[in-house]
Amino acid sequence: MFKDEARKSLLQKRQNLSQTECIKWDDLLLIQFQKLDFSNIQTIGSFYPMEKHNEPNTILLTSYLQELIPDLIIAYPVIDKAFGTMHFYEATDELVLNAMGIYEPNQNKLIPSNDIDCFLVPLLGFDLLGHRLGFGKGYYDKYFSTCQNPCQRIGISYFEPIPNIQDTHEFDVPLTHCITPWNRYEFK
């Protein structure tokens, strides 16, 4: 399946989810998430879920990690549309809604890419090789290419993988893991 076709199909499928389904599936995602190894995690890059896109509730996941790792630093991305880049800043209680409808932290404390041990990665879908299907802007792939230290890249998906994304590019950075409400996937 090609990215544009898959993106359109999966976005529609996710938009058709009821609030009840999302809440139930978020709980199931948390169960799968709790089975992953976070023993070496000190800083996590996450994202604030966009309700208008029925994104999985990452707040449940990061709250679990905060209980597991009391000194955990959580960072959220700030997007610079003019340069097509993003950077992660330490998350605070005060988030600001940007022009794209994404909540971002204030930009007081930049977290260098090499300091982030694990990322929760937004996506519409993924394939059996760990290729991620996002919204098509390439922000995450560009950012991941700046990470020199090994890090976990965990996709969070309501849906099982599609067999194959046919039009991947050499600059696409694959996930290391992905969770769905029913399964965990690990990619090499």
Which residues does each predicted region cover?
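Conserved phosphate- and dinucleotide-binding cores of soluble alpha/beta proteins
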Residues: 82-188
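N-terminal active-site beta-alpha-beta segment that forms phosphate/nucleotide-binding
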Residues: 1-97, 103-107
